């Protein structure tokens, strides 16, 4: 699709979203066609909700998020086939794999293990592996990435190349509020089991999160070497574990010591060469 066509599509969707109270299941024509076209672009990886520039800054294509939201107004509930034991679901969003056969899977080039769930408009790149996991609509999963068992990739989340999302990891989805950016895991990151990254936070390239690290917008991310406290973004090639910090007030009103509060701790930073040659367990050893 040309830049002119994309601009026209964006204009139609922006106007429809501004007038969304009048968009419903009876809406036909240009608006429905535009939303369908946008969802297809997302599904095929030809457009992304967020894109990284050469300067490392991520730009959010809000109009694509709006297309996803409009699709809920346009589409009725329907039976979704493919459940275990020939069971079905009841939803507005079909499976990405609806009507797929051998040819489609071979062309797509990724592995989809039984009981993984991928909703339409999510993109899965070649050589990715989906264990029994959940990938929500509008998400992007990069080439060679592993989405391990019971991991969740939320709506519009952006997962880079050669990322490992370990068992039970949660990558939060962000559709609303509209101004919020998606949660982003950049290339070559390792996210340890049962960790959670949510609320549009960014884990920069090559970083390692140990097991059970939770990062949201209000989570303190503390660099142990410098004492710097940051929020919302883990720097490139950081090794991060769960930790705690003393409260601002050393004692409570009753005289007892104040409880320590959770934080994420950057225990070390490594360069790209070290990261590529060093095992994950070795990096996480203190």
From Swiss-Prot:
Q: Which EC number(s) does UniProt give?
A: 2.3.1.117
What InterPro entries does the annotation carry? DapD_Trfase_Hexpep_rpt_fam, Hexapep, Hexapep_transf_CS, THP_succinylTrfase_dom1, THP_succinylTrfase_N_sf, Trans_hexapeptide_repeat, Trimer_LpxA-like_sf
Its ancestry begins with: Bacteria, Pseudomonadati, Pseudomonadota, Alphaproteobacteria, Hyphomicrobiales
**Which keywords has UniProt assigned to this entry?**
Acyltransferase, Amino-acid biosynthesis, Cytoplasm, Diaminopimelate biosynthesis, Lysine biosynthesis, Repeat, Transferase
- Give, as one word, the top-level EC class: transferase
Q: Which domain of life is it from?
A: Bacteria
- Name of the protein described by the UniProt record: 2,3,4,5-tetrahydropyridine-2,6-dicarboxylate N-succinyltransferase
Its Gene Ontology molecular function terms?
2,3,4,5-tetrahydropyridine-2,6-dicarboxylate N-succinyltransferase activity
Where would you find this protein in the cell? Cytoplasm
Which reaction equation describes what this protein catalyses?
A: (S)-2,3,4,5-tetrahydrodipicolinate + succinyl-CoA + H2O = (S)-2-succinylamino-6-oxoheptanedioate + CoA
Q: Which family does it belong to?
A: Belongs to the transferase hexapeptide repeat family.
Q: In which pathway does it act?
A: Amino-acid biosynthesis; L-lysine biosynthesis via DAP pathway; LL-2,6-diaminopimelate from (S)-tetrahydrodipicolinate (succinylase route): step 1/3
Check the record and name the Gene3D superfamilies matching this protein: Hexapeptide repeat proteins, Tetrahydrodipicolinate-N-succinyltransferase, N-terminal domain
PROSITE patterns recorded: HEXAPEP_TRANSFERASES (PS00101)
Q: Which GO terms describe its cellular component?
A: cytoplasm
The record ties this protein, via NCBIfam families, to: dapD, PRK11830.1
Q: Which GO terms describe its biological process?
A: diaminopimelate biosynthetic process; lysine biosynthetic process via diaminopimelate
What's the main place this protein lives? Answer: cytoplasm
Q: Signal: is it a keyword of this entry?
A: no
Q: Does the keyword Cell membrane apply?
A: no
Q: Which SUPFAM superfamilies match?
A: Trimeric LpxA-like enzymes
